[in-house]
C-alpha cells in the first residue's frame, strides 16, 4: 500500500475521531451568553468541516479501490481477472 493511501486512511480516522468528540461537546453545551452562541456556532462549523474531510477522504479512497466497512476497517478491492464480478477484498 502506498503512502498516499496510508495518509488518506489516517486523515479519515482522525476526522472521525474529531467528529465524535465534537458531537459529544455540542450535545453537552449550554448556551446562555453571546460568547456561548459564538462558540456553539464555531463548534458546528468545525463539525461540518470534519464531516466534509471524512466524506472527501472516503471518496478519494474509493477511487483507489479502497473500501470502508461499517466497523471502520479498510479493504482493498482487487479485480482478479479484469471482470467486475470476479473481485476479492484484502484487509489493510
Predicted regions located by residue number:
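Short, charge/polar-rich alpha-helical segments
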Residues: 1-16
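Intrinsic low-complexity/disordered segments
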Residues: 5, 24, 85-87
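Ordered hydrophobic segments in well-structured contexts
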Residues: 7-9, 21, 25, 75
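Generic structural concept
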Residues: 9-12, 23, 44-47, 51
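Non-transmembrane amphipathic alpha-helical segments
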Residues: 15, 19-26, 57
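Short, charge-rich amphipathic interface segments used for partner binding and complex assembly
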Residues: 28, 34-80
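Short acidic DE-rich linear segments
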Residues: 75-92
Amino acid at each position: 500500500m502506498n503512502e498516499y493511501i496510508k495518509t488518506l486512511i489516517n486523515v479519515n480516522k482522525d476526522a472521525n475521531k474529531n467528529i465524535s468528540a465534537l458531537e459529544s461537546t455540542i450535545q453537552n453545551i449550554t448556551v446562555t451568553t453571546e460568547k456561548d452562541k459564538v462558540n456553539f456556532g464555531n463548534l458546528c462549523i468545525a463539525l461540518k468541516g470534519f464531516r466534509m474531510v471524512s466524506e472527501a477522504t472516503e471518496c478519494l479512497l474509493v477511487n483507489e479501490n479502497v473500501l470502508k466497512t461499517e466497523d471502520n476497517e479498510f479493504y482493498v478491492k482487487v479485480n482478479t481477472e479484469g471482470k467486475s464480478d470476479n473481485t476479492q477484498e484484502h484487509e489493510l
